[in-house]
């Protein structure tokens, strides 16, 4: 009996010692992917997906707030283990960091105030700083004068005040915005230019962290197979 108890204690200690604690960085001002609740806790689609993956690989997840344009530089400096913040997988980013398999299929859209600007009449466009949406706007839509924002919430304020005519961003994020701002509507068609977006969103890691990438991919495949991913998707994206 004593031997059995000792074995159980040692086994438990071994599991606890080997359990990973992983820190994921994100900018929590991008609902429905990441935001904060009334208690100041980071919540959202990315958080739930990460927690589900960590449960599958028997790791403990921690989340920390970072500005979006600092995610990749700080990841390269190994200040955290991974970044999950609705990051589009692009060739340019893949040269700097290692990506997991895509966990979400992304697209981009335009929004404007109802009855105001169209894609043809708009002159000033708002985008989030450091994103592929900013890169696309600067390179591909030279008919617009771009204005960058730390968050889309700031862009909304300028849209309402008339400082910008339209906003360009992730379709799901803009849909969440419209659900809270009834005077805003989608205009034009979705954009899926694979040079900038359309390859999906991925979890970013340091280039050398191939073991972690393999673990996260294994966990992602598991939650897609067991239905947990769909539950999370329905909770945050399907409304």
Curated annotation (Swiss-Prot):
Subcellular localization is given as: Periplasm
Which family is this protein grouped under?
A: Belongs to the bacterial solute-binding protein 3 family.
Q: What does this protein do?
A: Part of the ABC transporter complex ArtPIQM involved in arginine transport.
Keywords tagged on the record: Amino-acid transport, Periplasm, Signal, Transport
Q: Which PROSITE patterns match?
A: SBP_BACTERIAL_3
Indicate the quaternary assembly.
Answer: The complex is composed of two ATP-binding proteins (ArtP), two transmembrane proteins (ArtM and ArtQ) and a solute-binding protein (ArtI).
Q: Where are the transmembrane segments?
A: none
Offer an example of a GO molecular function term for this protein. amino acid binding
Recall the taxonomic lineage recorded for the source organism.
Bacteria, Pseudomonadati, Pseudomonadota, Gammaproteobacteria, Pasteurellales
Q: Which GO terms describe its cellular component?
A: outer membrane-bounded periplasmic space
The keyword Signal appears for this protein: yes
Q: Which gene encodes it?
A: artI
The name on file for this protein is ABC transporter arginine-binding protein
Which residues belong to the signal peptide in this entry?
1-19
**Record's InterPro entries?**
Lys_Arg_Orn-bd, SBP_3_CS, Solute-binding_3/MltF_N
Disulfide bonds, paired cysteine numbers = none
Q: Does the keyword Lipid biosynthesis apply?
A: no
Origin organism of this chain?
A: Haemophilus influenzae (strain ATCC 51907 / DSM 11121 / KW20 / Rd)
Give the principal location in a single coarse category: periplasm
One BP annotation, GO = amino acid transport
